[in-house]
From Swiss-Prot:
Residues 787-809 have a biased composition (Basic and acidic residues). It comes from the Bacteria. The keyword Acyltransferase does not apply. This is Uncharacterized protein SYNPCC7002_B0001. It comes from Picosynechococcus sp. (strain ATCC 27264 / PCC 7002 / PR-6) (Agmenellum quadruplicatum).
Length: 1000
């Protein structure tokens, strides 16, 4: 049976050898081919008839082998025998599909052939399903569209049909407001068009871009670019969504994800807004999804498509390929017998509030019944104490007073996991132990990046490495649980145990507590949380009891716990208010002192509770029917997971109100701010290598310990990349995460902008007053002597006066200046690091290498230094680069500059643009003027050029800027530092340094 119509394609300019084919391409389809497209893939009959035809005999050769390259044809134009033999299978027939060339608007010669009896791949012997013309550039499938489908697409996207006889794809190009879906293959493109979407098909997942090669045949990835057809479409902020197959093979998933990331990045660079469509149904391709579940399923998934950056984050945290057991339980209640006896590493991913810790408690009890000791490692002292209580073991601080003395096990913070800590930890004492890493993502992230671990990080990582190996080799087990468990922690543990026969077992609990009862989410936009503050105050005035989470505690931040407390105490004197932050929980006499252990007993006593990230993780607030709402204000300091963790501390199902900035400030980004682990690792290695060269060869020596601990550096880079991606699309990422956890976004009622501004201004006035009072108090308090100062630094519990004393002592010793309110503010703004750069660039240059060597020696353990730590602390690479950029020219008062006089400076900076980015954290582009570049770099030293005016002849007037000497007492600071460094280095036998000291 033949299905045909009277359509005949128009003539098409192209290769002469294919012209006759182009003129005679009538559309006729065999019944089997028609059913494959229409019934099997859900393509409209009209689209199938316009784009597909059945071929057999010699005709397919003319469609496929039209290239005029000598490799294909002899001098007389005839196809070479090798090609005829290779493609002999086409004579058995098949279907051909081709559409429109959007570059010309005419029919495309290029297309795809699917043989009824396909040839096999010479390597893997699998049938090659789809054939594309060889020795010609690949294109995309932009299928011809009938008027009915066109009308359907126009209606869906609310774009008017053209009155003139304009082609469909010309219409699409002319309307960038029309979104486009990219899929793989012609049939899927046809199915999407039929469903009412502008869709194009790639012949393969990697065919959206091209990678040039150098003379040696090596790919030049930095020169990758979109194919011309995609470049045409990716303009003017057009929305483009990927809709590739949802495969289950790990290797294929990795390939598809890589293709989306690369193509998506190029599309965004070209001006498109990129997203990704995913689904959980068994349907592999989008045509399967439509045929099996209907177009509504596609509409639903399109509605819930994820921005590229958010999808990349989800992709980095997806563990589905590692899962051994999937359950759907409100509270984890897995029979221990369901876990294989030989499984020594158990990973658990289960949502917040699903009883992970309670289930671990049962496991711990079974281990103790078998006479195995249990070691619980956490990232926070309070959490360690809480877990010790819940798991019925000792906290490390209780060993001396406990009747069991740690015989059953203990809980401790990972900061103490090394022999030189107060715990004097010895991994050899944990023979056959069961180790629990509750909230493993937080624990490992803390071990790898927390400033509290910096001094001993090399020892901590070595001990952790040895502990895991020793415990498991002696029959122990490792339990790793987290609501946000990612492949990063999973693979780090695997790397530690590389070469060992330890079997992992991964449990995934798919239950989402927010779905049990609908949890409402009110999500606020805007550049600041004034609208949220307005509704919060309204809720308080209406009698609601509110739990408020904010990212800051200090008075220097407008929306901090301290400033909100002051405002609310003034406005609502009848309300019972509790502030919980790092200072209040450690301040004797404060109502929040030591409250973390008993929140469920304390919080019901209050109407308004204000929390900082001190209550971000490790706390479960289980009280019911007390709080009416939860309010969250982020500033971009917390990670995406960290912010969402805070919102979930209260288990009760009450509405959540959330405001966060669109993007996190660049100052919060980790390492070089990169979005890929490879980029971060590359720059970490470069920085460390440069430091080694600049401070002396002895620092480059390392033991075999570095090889053993390489997996930790790679994990650090992966965690950093994940966090940076979240920071780069902060608002989108947090909203997506909350919605994926089951929250339901609700519409906000209209807010009076004038009232919101008044409320914001009131809080800002409170902040200005509080911040000034605090700075004055710090400046007026007595400067502690050295003994008192050291005691204050070690002291955990401190009164407000003691905190001010410690800060005063630090400022006095750091700057050598009289402590004033102005100095406190400058220090808060990062003045110390700015002056430090200028000091070692100028008068202190002779001491820079010695300083960095001392830092290296402090951090090293058996010749090993964790590179991110030494990179954060070493200044030599920064100083070296600033010298290469000739920054000294701007430090001479009275010297003037114009854009023209700094052209050479700009060229030099552009030459070093990449090192400027990963060493100084500044982005330099060709679009910046020379003076803009100079000001950006001088900002690193808290300096700037002063504008003097426009001078010169009428035809050549130029803006003139002058270098000025800052009037901020920095010379006194430098003199203080010079005296300090001379005293430290006076006894060092180094001719260069000794000569400098004598000259100084």
């Amino acid at each position: 049976m033949i299905v045909s119509d009277n359509f005949t394609s128009s003539s098409n300019t192209g290769a002469d050898l294919a012209s006759s084919v182009s003129e005679n391409r009538s559309h006729f389809i065999a019944e089997s081919h028609y059913r494959e497209w229409v019934e099997g893939s859900g393509v409209a009959p009209e689209i199938a008839r316009l784009n597909v035809r059945s071929l057999s005999g010699m005709t397919p050769y003319e469609y496929l082998l039209y290239s005029d390259e000598p490799a294909l044809r002899r001098n007389d134009g005839r196809l070479r025998d090798t090609w005829l033999k290779r493609y002999a299978f086409v004579e058995h027939g098949g279907w051909w599909c081709s559409g429109i060339d959007i570059k010309t608007g005419k029919d495309s010669l290029w297309g795809c052939f699917k043989g009824d009896r396909p040839r096999k791949d010479r390597e893997d012997k699998k049938p090659i399903k789809y054939e594309h013309p060889p020795r010609v550039a690949t294109e995309i499938f932009t299928l011809k569209v009938d008027r009915g489908t066109w009308r359907k697409i126009a209606k869906r996207h609310k774009v008017e049909l053209p009155e003139t006889d304009q082609g469909f794809w010309e219409w699409v190009l002319a309307h960038p407001e029309l979104p486009i879906i990219i899929t793989e293959g012609a049939k899927k493109a046809g199915a999407l068009l039929t469903a009412g979407y502008c869709a194009i098909g790639l012949p393969g997942i990697y065919n959206g871009y091209r990678t040039p090669k150098n003379d040696h045949g090596e790919p030049m990835r930095q020169l990758r670019h979109l194919i011309p057809e995609l470049d045409l479409l990716a303009k003017n902020n057009r929305a483009i969504a990927f809709c590739f197959d949802q495969d289950k093979k790990p290797k294929t998933i990795k390939a598809v994800n890589g293709a989306i990331q690369t193509t998506g990045a190029l599309l965004e660079k070209a001006g498109a807004k990129v997203s990704v469509i995913t689904w959980h149904q068994d349907a592999k391709g989008v045509d399967d999804l439509i045929v099996e579940h209907g177009a509504k399923a596609l509409h639903n998934r399109y509605k819930h498509r994820k921005p590229l950056a958010v999808w990349e984050m989800d992709n980095l945290t997806d563990i589905t390929t590692q899962v051994d057991l999937t359950v759907d339980q409100r509270y984890l209640d897995i029979d221990p017998r369901a876990i294989p006896k030989d499984a020594q590493i158990i990973f658990i991913k289960s949502a917040k509030g699903t009883g992970k810790t309670e289930w671990l408690g049962k496991i711990v009890k079974l281990a103790q019944d078998d006479c195995a000791r249990v070691l619980v490692l956490t990232h926070r002292i309070q959490l360690a104490k809480e877990l010790a209580r819940r798991l019925d073991i000792d906290h490390i601080s209780e060993l001396d007073s406990s009747p069991t003395g740690g015989a059953l096990g203990m809980a401790m913070c990972i900061d103490s996991l090394h022999p030189d800590s107060q715990a004097h930890f010895n991994f050899m004492e944990w023979h056959g132990a069961h180790i629990v890493l509750d909230e493993i993502e937080q624990v490992l992230g803390h071990a790898l990046g927390s400033s509290t671990c910096t001094q001993d990080r090399a020892k901590i990582l070595e001990t952790f490495y040895n502990l895991i190996l020793y415990a498991l080799r002696t029959g122990g087990k490792l339990y790793c649980s987290d609501a946000d468990l990612s492949p990063i922690s999973y693979e780090l543990i695997k790397y530690i145990l590389d070469g060992c026969e330890f079997k992992p077992f991964t449990i995934l609990n798919t239950y989402k507590p927010c779905l049990e009862q609908q949890r409402d989410l009110f999500f606020y936009e805007g550049n600041d949380p004034r609208d949220l503050l307005t509704n919060l105050r309204q809720a308080i005035e209406n009698g609601e009891k509110t739990l408020v989470f904010t990212a800051a505690q200090k008075t220097a931040s407008t929306y901090s716990t301290q400033n909100l407390e002051s405002l609310f105490r003034e406005k609502y004197p009848d309300k019972r208010i509790l502030r919980i932050d790092a200072e209040s929980v450690a301040e004797p006499g404060h109502p929040a002192y030591g409250c973390i252990d008993s929140l469920n007993a304390i919080l019901p006593l209050y109407d308004i509770v204000l929390c900082s990230p001190a209550v971000e993780t490790g706390v479960s607030i289980d009280i019911k029917d007390h709080f009416d709402s939860v309010w969250g204000m982020g500033s971009g300091v917390q990670t995406v997971n960290g912010f969402c963790q805070g919102l979930e501390r209260l288990r009760d199902n009450v509405p959540r109100h959330v405001w966060i900035p669109k993007f996190s400030p660049h100052s919060n980004r980790i390492a070089n701010g990169g979005y890929t682990a490879k980029a971060i690792a590359r720059d970490q290695h470069r920085y460390a290598e440069l430091t080694h060269k600049l401070i002396g060869e002895h620092a480059a020596e390392c033991s075999g310990l570095e090889d053993s601990l390489k997996p930790f550096l790679w994990a650090y880079c992966r965690y950093a990349a994940l966090a940076n991606r979240g920071f780069g699309s902060y608002r989108e990422a947090i909203l997506n995460k909350l919605l994926s956890e089951g929250y339901v976004q609700k519409d906000l009622s209209e807010i009076d902008p004038a009232l919101a501004k008044d409320y914001r201004d009131e809080l800002k006035a409170v902040k200005d007053h509080n911040y000034l009072q605090e700075r004055v108090a710090i400046s007026k308090v007595e400067n502690p002597d050295d003994r008192q100062y050291e005691k204050l630094k070690r002291q955990r519990a401190k009164s407000e006066t003691e905190r001010h004393q410690e800060r005063h002592g630090k400022l006095s010793r750091s700057y050598g200046l009289t402590v004033t309110p102005e100095l406190v503010e400058k220090d808060d703004d990062g003045w110390y690091s700015q002056l430090q750069l200028e000091y070692y660039l100028t008068v202190g240059k002779a001491f820079c290498s010695a300083r960095d060597r001392a830092k290296y020696d402090q951090l090293q353990h058996e010749g090993f230094v964790f590179k991110p730590d030494i990179n954060r602390r070493s200044l030599s690479p920064k100083i070296h680069l600033l010298e290469l950029l000739n920054i000294h020219q701007f430090l001479k008062p009275g010297v003037t500059f114009t854009g023209a006089s700094l052209e050479g400076f700009k060229e030099n900076c552009l030459r070093y643009a990449k090192p400027i980015k990963w060493i100084l954290g500044r982005t330099i582009t060709d679009k910046m003027s020379p003076l803009e570049i100079a000001q950006a770099l001088l900002g690193k030293l808290d300096r700037k050029l002063e504008y003097k005016g426009r001078f010169g002849s009428r035809d050549n007037r130029q803006r003139v800027y002058e270098a000025i000497a800052p009037n901020d007492q920095r010379e006194k600071v430098f003199a203080h530092w010079l005296q300090r460094d001379q005293a430290k280095l006076g006894a060092v036998s180094n001719p260069c340094i000794n000569r400098f000291i004598q000259e100084a």
